[in-house]
A protein has these predicted regions:
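Flexible loop/turn connectors
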Residues: 241-242, 249-307
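Bacterial N-terminal signal peptides that target proteins for export
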Residues: 2-11
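C-terminal motif of bacterial Sec signal peptides marking the signal peptidase cleavage site
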Residues: 19-22
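Bacterial Sec signal peptide processing site at the extreme N-terminus
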Residues: 24-34
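Flexible loop/hinge segments that line or gate small-molecule binding clefts
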Residues: 101-141, 149-152, 159, 250-260, ...
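Hinge/cleft segment of the Venus flytrap/periplasmic-binding protein
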Residues: 163, 171, 181-183, 278-326
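Hydrophobic alpha-helical
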Residues: 94-113, 179, 191, 197-258
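Hinge/beta->alpha junction and helix N-cap segments in small-molecule ligand-binding domains
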Residues: 40-53, 69-79, 102, 124, ...
Length: 326
C-alpha cells in the first residue's frame, strides 16, 4: 500500500483543524445600531450638573447615541479608574469623555481604554496620553484672567492665598501657572497654593487657617468651582466680607449670589453645558467616521467668561434657562 506523503498528511490535518475551529466559532458581532458615550466627571459639584444638561441635550438630538453620565463622587483616581473600566466592561462604551484627575498617573489607564474606545478629555486634559481630542477651556489663559481680576480688586497690591482641589490635575496646574504669569511684576504676592482633595469641608478649613495665620491677607483666589463658595462661607462666619477680596472660578449659585452682594469681586466662568453638549456631539461624529471635527492640534477651546457685578444678573438668567429653573 502506498503511504500518504508526510507533508501532505500534515497539511491535511491542519486544514481539518482550521475547518473545525471556524465552524465552531461564533459569528462576528454586527455593528451596534446605537452608540454609547460615557461622560465621566472628576468630582461632584453644581458645575457637573450643568454639564449633564448639555449631555442630555445632545442625547435627545442624536437618535443613534445614548449617554451614560458617571459622577466621581469621592474625587479619587481609583474611583475614576473604576468608572472608566465600568464604562468599557459593563456599558460597552464606544466613547468616553473624561476629566482626568491625574493625567500622568492615569496615562496607562487612558491609553488602554483608547485601545477599546474613543477617548475625549474634557474640562481637564491628559496631553501626553492617546486621547483623540481635548475639549474645554484654555486653562492657562483662564488663570491669566483670574490674575487680571485680582489685580483690579487689589490696585494697591497685597498678599493672596490660592486654593484648589488637587495640584496635579492639568487644569489646576495650568490655571495656577496662568495666574502667576499675570501677576509677574505686580504688587500682588502669592503666599502659597493650598489643596483640599476636592473636599469642600477641607476647603473651608484651609480658608479659616489662612485667615488665622495671615491676618493681613488681602485676597483669596479659588481655582475650582466649590472654592469660591467655601471661601465665602468662612468670610461671612468671621465677619471678613469686603475686607478680603475674592476671585474664583465657575458659576455655582453661591458664587453668583456672592457677586451680586459684592462679597466676591468676580469669577472666571467656564461653559460646562458646552463641555457636555459638544463632547457628545463630537464623539458621535467621530464614531461615524467623520474626523473633520478634530483640529490639527487635537484641541477645541471653549471660551471662559468674566462674571462681575455688572453682568451677573444677565448671566444668571441665561444659566437658569439652560438648567430649566427660575
Amino acid at each position: 500500500m502506498k503511504k500518504l506523503a508526510q507533508p501532505k498528511f500534515i497539511y491535511l490535518l491542519a486544514f481539518i483543524f482550521a475547518l473545525s475551529v471556524s465552524c465552531g466559532s461564533p459569528p462576528p458581532k454586527p455593528p451596534k445600531a446605537v452608540k454609547t458615550v460615557a461622560f465621566v466627571t472628576n468630582t461632584t459639584s453644581d458645575f457637573w450638573k450643568v454639564a449633564r444638561k448639555g449631555c442630555e441635550k445632545a442625547d435627545a438630538e442624536l437618535p443613534d447615541v445614548t449617554v451614560s453620565f458617571k459622577t466621581t463622587n469621592e474625587g479619587t483616581v481609583e474611583e475614576q479608574n473604576r468608572l472608566i473600566r465600568q464604562s468599557l466592561d459593563r456599558d460597552d462604551a464606544d466613547a468616553i469623555a473624561v476629566s482626568p484627575i491625574d493625567p500622568v498617573g492615569q496615562k496607562n489607564v487612558i491609553n488602554n481604554a483608547a485601545k477599546r474606545a474613543l477617548i475625549i478629555t474634557q474640562d481637564s486634559d491628559a496631553p501626553d496620553s492617546d486621547r483623540t481630542l481635548y475639549l474645554g477651556a484654555d486653562n492657562r489663559a483662564a488663570g491669566r484672567q483670574a490674575g487680571e481680576l485680582i489685580k483690579q480688586a487689589l490696585p494697591e497690591g497685597g498678599k493672596i492665598m490660592v486654593f484648589v482641589g488637587k495640584r496635579e490635575v492639568q487644569n489646576a496646574r495650568e490655571r495656577f501657572d496662568g495666574l502667576k504669569e499675570s501677576l509677574q511684576g505686580s504688587k500682588v504676592e502669592i503666599i502659597d497654593l493650598m489643596t483640599d482633595d476636592a473636599d469642600p469641608s477641607r476647603a473651608m478649613q484651609n480658608a479659616a487657617d489662612t485667615l488665622k495665620k495671615y491676618p493681613d491677607i488681602a485676597g483669596m483666589v479659588g481655582l475650582w468651582s466649590y472654592n469660591g463658595p467655601s471661601i465665602l462661607k468662612v468670610l461671612k462666619s468671621l465677619d471678613k466680607v469686603g475686607k478680603v477680596k475674592v476671585v474664583c472660578f465657575d458659576d455655582e449659585r453661591e458664587t453668583l449670589d456672592g457677586i451680586k452682594e459684592g462679597a466676591i469681586f468676580g469669577t472666571v466662568a467656564q461653559q460646562p453645558f458646552e463641555y457636555g453638549y459638544q463632547a457628545v456631539q463630537a464623539a458621535a461624529k467621530i464614531l461615524k467616521g467623520d474626523r473633520s471635527v478634530i483640529p490639527g492640534n487635537k484641541t477645541i477651546f471653549i471660551p471662559t467668561l468674566i462674571i462681575q457685578r455688572n453682568n451677573v444678573d444677565e448671566y444668571s438668567k441665561k444659566l437658569n434657562q439652560l438648567l430649566g429653573s427660575t
